[in-house]
Amino acid sequence: MQTPKREFLDHAMTERVCRRVEAGRGERNRRWLACWLGILLPFAWLWFCLIDNLSVEWASNPQYGYGWVVPVLCVGLICRRWNTLRAASSSGLDGRRPLSGKGGMVIVGAFILLALLYLPTRLIEGATPEWRIIQWSLGFETVGLTLCAIYLACGPLCLKRCLFPICFILIAIPWPTLIEAPVIQSLTRVNSRVVIELLSWLGIPAVQHGNLIEVNTGTIGIDEACSGMRSFQTSLMISLFFGEFYDMGRLRRLLLVPAGFILAMLLNVCRMSFLSIVAAKKGVAAIAQYHDPAGIMITLACTAGLWGLAALFNHGRIPAPGFLSPVEGRNEEVKNSKLRLPLLRRLGFALLLWLATVDAGAELWYRSLESHLAPGPKWSVVFPADNPTFKIVPISADTKNLLRFDEGKQGAWIDSDGSRWQAFYFNWRPGRVAGYLAKRHTPEICLPATGRELLSGPKLTLMNVKDVALPMRSYVFGTEGGPIYVFQCRWEGGAARNAYVEEESSRFNLIRGIWAGRGKKGQKVLEIVIARVNRPEQAEAAVARQLEKLVVVEEQ
């Protein structure tokens, strides 16, 4: 029998041992947390930069508004596969070091290459964040680095299971303009043509002008956000998601995509036909009442239809065999984690240091560059209100929502020589999205949608009006009533004269923005359309004379 003193000593010793164990456990937990923070933090920053870049497009362009749900769906797909991912991570390396064999070395080489490519991507993105090629580059780098890390951490089996959920974010990146523009025009024209036929069967007279439909009460503008392109992209996203959600085979997934596209096109034709009938019966202004509800209805109907179709395709399918259960692979997972963590920790901290250096360097570069840029003259546009033929043309709500300018106006008038004029003026105050929104639409994209044919242009002419350098790009479009001449100026505050280069939107000249600044000092767009003029030279001379009257320079 132990004495009270012995019992007291044993109890005190037990308490000291417990405190030491708890202290050691707390220290290990802190080290474990610091280790994984160092590994995960650079990838969290990469994904934040990608979503932050794309969020401007998602918020300002209805065509890509579905992008907001894509990151959520990516996380949902990963959570759905969580148990199989844990089992795959414990069995994927088979006890070997991640760098054993050529495959591991290739992955590490790809990891280093993608990390190095982040430097030019981030530098160019600072000047032209709206450039689709840069958005895709940032997307591939983010996805590629994440997949490389998953392979090194968990092995090839886990990489295979994570491949689709991680790559699914690419569906939310805007398509390159060279692909997007012709697809938009083609799908919208097909939709409009089908609607015209349906209206004729219903006894409603209608005429197609490019992407526009003219009925007896006016012209219906079927803009890009309401075209088949939006329906196609949304249906593609939904089809791919349900194919992965139900873990379908390749054939079923390939069948689901065109089936979704056909369903989306049919629903979009129904929507356009409904809006056209409303316009013919109640007037074009009545469309605003049904525009958004009709769009929401076809999106919900498309989602429900594809969900049902995916469930039908998956009916009676035998699930594919899974991986080891988490319990069976737990011991192997502990052994492999000891081999992976040192490598992942080194790569994670190296990547974190590299990303911080690149982003800090890019910010310092642009701040230093912009500190030497002059703000430029303050000018605005005053329309010829004293002309008896002048009238203010209201700006549609869709245009306001799409361009989101701070100041905008448009007007039309007839000059003394009989030429017809129409002018648009938009102003964006200094800010992050000023350059982004000002560069969005150009005449060669918008006017063909209204049935005009581009005959020539763009041709750059630098016009000096009251000591203000205006980079005018001229176009000639063919119409049923003869050619029209379009002059568009996108003026950027603080930009030097040599910053205005011909074919500014081309993929190579956009790199010049690295030396021109980020375009955050404000943007102005002035567009002038002239009709009933015989020659381009005559139109250019008339614009030069008219600009002297329209442009007003404020005293500084």
Question: Predicted segment positions?
Answer:
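Hydrophobic N-terminal alpha-helices or hydrophobic patches in metabolic proteins across all domains
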Residues: Q2-Q556
